[in-house]
From Swiss-Prot:
Key words of the record: Disulfide bond, Host cell membrane, Host membrane, Host-virus interaction, Hydrogen ion transport, Inhibition of host autophagy by virus, Ion channel, Ion transport, Lipoprotein, Membrane, Palmitate, Phosphoprotein, Signal-anchor, Transmembrane, Transmembrane helix, Transport, Viral ion channel, Virion
Name assigned to this protein: Matrix protein 2
Virion surface side: 1-22
Record gene name: M
Record InterPro entries: Flu_M2
Subunit structure: Homotetramer; composed of two disulfide-linked dimers held together by non-covalent interactions. May interact with matrix protein 1.
Biological source species: Influenza A virus (strain A/Swine/Netherlands/12/1985 H1N1)
Amino acid sequence: MSLLTEVETPTRNGWGCRFSDSSDPLVIAASIIGILHLILWILDRLFFKCIYRLLKYGLKRGPSTEGVPESMREEYRQEQQSAVDVDDGHFVNIELE
């Protein structure tokens, strides 16, 4: 049994394709796997940064606050926000002559 799905053969009108036994379950399975592989490869190339970042860090968005009182949660949020806020006084301006 041949795994070729199409064979080019000379005909009266030139070269043409003749499909041989395309209803074979092995050929159908190989075609489906090939198409899925192509789709997954394209998605991987389009979204590789997102995919590998998600695999590396998971879905974690920060420490869990389960069981922590609301006052401590608010204090933590304020600390995180103050760490993000930028104070212009910390920068040094360098002027080139």
